[in-house]
């Protein structure tokens, strides 16, 4: 068993928390068994003084079974 790490950017129009969830959900689409997430950075787009898009740069760790059956 190896653990691999992927860097992703999650986005949300609601919150940074939802941006992190978005990144995790996207990573899970590949069938990866996610074991953890590390938030590296938060940013936001601002228009007319309001935050309109939240972004979270994350590292997602997942199990790599190298062709072995998952249990």
Per-range role (PLM):
Residues 1-37:
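Short, well-ordered alpha-helical segments
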Residues 42-71:
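A cross-kingdom feature marking charged/low-complexity
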């Amino acid at each position: 068993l190896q653990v691999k790490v992927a860097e992703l950017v999650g986005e949300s129009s609601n919150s940074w928390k939802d941006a992190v969830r978005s990144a995790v959900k996207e990573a899970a689409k590949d069938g990866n068994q996610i074991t953890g997430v590390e938030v590296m950075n938060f940013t936001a787009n601002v228009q007319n003084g309001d935050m309109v898009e939240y972004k979270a740069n994350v590292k997602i760790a997942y199990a790599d079974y190298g062709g072995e059956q998952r249990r």
